[in-house]
Amino acid sequence: MHLPSLSLAWALAGSSLALPQAEQPVLQDDRASSRAAAVKEAFSHAWDGYKKYAFPHDELHPISNGYGNSRNGWGASAVDALSTAIVMRNATIVHEILDHIATIDYSKTSDTVSLFETTIRYLGGMLSGYDLLKGPAADLVKDTSKVDILLKQSKNLGDILKFAFDTPSGVPYNNINITSHGHDGAKTNGLAVTGTLVLEWTRLSDLTGDPEYAQLSQKAESYLLHPQPSSAEPFPGLIGSNIDIKTGQFTDGHVSWNGGDDSYYEYLIKMYVYDPTRFALYRDRWVAAAESSIEHLASHPASRPDLTFLATYDGGRYGLSSQHLACFDGGNFLLGGTVLDRRDLIDFGLALVDACHETYSQTLTGIGPESFGWDANSVPADQKELYERAGFYVQNGAYILRPEVIESFYYAWRVTGRSEYRDWVWTAFVAINKTCRTGSGYAGLTNVNAENGGGRYDNQESFLFAEVLKYAYLTHSEELMAAEDAWQVQRGDGNQFVFNTEAHPIRVHHS
């Protein structure tokens, strides 16, 4: 999950049925190898450009060959790239990143720090690197002291950030000043921002033996698991979007799986995967939310009733619009469905995946838009043909290298074994590589439904490394060794790792 704002501070450059027990189709051949190699090449291309023009800053500006520091100036792209470099077994890049992480002083930044973004990118990236390099990828780094620094730096970062939870309720401030221990004076915090800390902070406690980090994040989460007042939960498991920092009470009952709400639901089932013993309540709340979503939020465009999207709900009114960010939902249903052995949830997840696939396959670039709608009464005049054909119209045509659609394709491939989903990942990757690639990296697009994507955004988000290229690679990697399979999503309840919302694999507690 990433917050949906597109108030970008960058320059514009230029204008089915599930088959849970199916055999994995054989793509262990030259085609699979060449696809995996192509994704690795894209990763190396983006890394080389970042290293040459932007390192150790946060992100590359891939058109002007400049750099940005939107994530505190600690080298977000490097930390976000670590777990992908590990699963690609690129020892050279892994060592470059480890050497950089050892030098970061997390106590120093002139920026306002986002507790949420810093947790999912930096803390998640380092904890994942530690879990992978202490486990199935231990052979990549012989000097274990370099790996140990990852946990030391994770603890340092947790200690620097934890004052954010020092509020009357324990619901944290998100936008904080780590030098003054101040904050932005916000009265509320968002559902996803509050509810997408618990995996990383619990893992930090489990690895260090210090329970404080888990206690802080789980105290904040407790208000989400037991929402008050009752109007905050219009349907079982589906809850409002904003929480009063002083009281822990919800201030609304607006329900969605869109950005700002999304990864709260994502982490409910993932916490159960992480540790079924401690987090059974999280599972129950996720099941309630999933079942309520099927009953109350499932929506079918009038022009394409075969498609299924999730609507929003607020005070008796439904909103028929969604986002690229929300397209993680199919993968989340698939994960929950396979872990809980619920065929109905798997089938619904596949329906969501199919609909989000349409948002890619029906545009001129083959890439999906930032946001889209399917309200038959609100179709723009110049998009009526698109709506009739595809079942949606574009509300915001930007693409900023988001991963969620490819992410759900990956889950569909892992859960069903059906090769069409693998092919969908490849087709999406080819479209991104064709349309977004620059001489030094990858740029965002202003309009996915315009020739060549319209204009370009001069920014390469760190989640290109962490998510897009990781999911594309894992879908096509040949799992020749049991160790290499360990970090993959598994059918059933045999997962050894669970991905945080930035696609960093975190080792589950009981393995």
Swiss-Prot record:
Disulphide bond pairs: C327-C356
GO cellular component, one term: endoplasmic reticulum
Main location: cytoplasm
This protein's pathway: Protein modification; protein glycosylation
Cofactor note: Ca(2+). Can also use Mg(2+), but with lower efficiency.
Cofactors that this protein relies on: Ca(2+); Mg(2+)
Binding site for Ca(2+): T501
The keyword Signal is assigned to this record: yes
Keywords assigned: Carbohydrate metabolism, Cytoplasmic vesicle, Disulfide bond, Glycoprotein, Glycosidase, Hydrolase, Metal-binding, Signal
GO molecular-function term, one example from the UniProt record: mannosyl-oligosaccharide 1,2-alpha-mannosidase activity
Subcellular location: Cytoplasmic vesicle lumen
Enzyme Commission identifier(s): 3.2.1.113
Signal peptide: 1-18
Catalytic activity: N(4)-(alpha-D-Man-(1->2)-alpha-D-Man-(1->2)-alpha-D-Man-(1->3)-[alpha-D-Man-(1->2)-alpha-D-Man-(1->3)-[alpha-D-Man-(1->2)-alpha-D-Man-(1->6)]-alpha-D-Man-(1->6)]-beta-D-Man-(1->4)-beta-D-GlcNAc-(1->4)-beta-D-GlcNAc)-L-asparaginyl-[protein] (N-glucan mannose isomer 9A1,2,3B1,2,3) + 4 H2O = N(4)-(alpha-D-Man-(1->3)-[alpha-D-Man-(1->3)-[alpha-D-Man-(1->6)]-alpha-D-Man-(1->6)]-beta-D-Man-(1->4)-beta-D-GlcNAc-(1->4)-beta-D-GlcNAc)-L-asparaginyl-[protein] (N-glucan mannose isomer 5A1,2) + 4 beta-D-mannose; N(4)-(alpha-D-Man-(1->2)-alpha-D-Man-(1->2)-alpha-D-Man-(1->3)-[alpha-D-Man-(1->3)-[alpha-D-Man-(1->2)-alpha-D-Man-(1->6)]-alpha-D-Man-(1->6)]-beta-D-Man-(1->4)-beta-D-GlcNAc-(1->4)-beta-D-GlcNAc)-L-asparaginyl-[protein] (N-glucan mannose isomer 8A1,2,3B1,3) + 3 H2O = N(4)-(alpha-D-Man-(1->3)-[alpha-D-Man-(1->3)-[alpha-D-Man-(1->6)]-alpha-D-Man-(1->6)]-beta-D-Man-(1->4)-beta-D-GlcNAc-(1->4)-beta-D-GlcNAc)-L-asparaginyl-[protein] (N-glucan mannose isomer 5A1,2) + 3 beta-D-mannose
GO terms for biological process, alphabetical: carbohydrate metabolic process; ERAD pathway; protein glycosylation
Catalytic residues (UniProt): E370 (proton donor)
Enzyme class label: hydrolase
UniProt-listed Gene3D superfamilies: 1.50.10.10
Record's keyword annotation contains Plastid: no
Glycosylation sites: N90, N177, N433
Assembly and binders: Monomer.
Entry function: Involved in the maturation of Asn-linked oligosaccharides. Progressively trims alpha-1,2-linked mannose residues from Man(9)GlcNAc(2) to produce Man(5)GlcNAc(2).
Record-stated family: Belongs to the glycosyl hydrolase 47 family.
Name under which the protein is recorded: Probable mannosyl-oligosaccharide alpha-1,2-mannosidase 1B
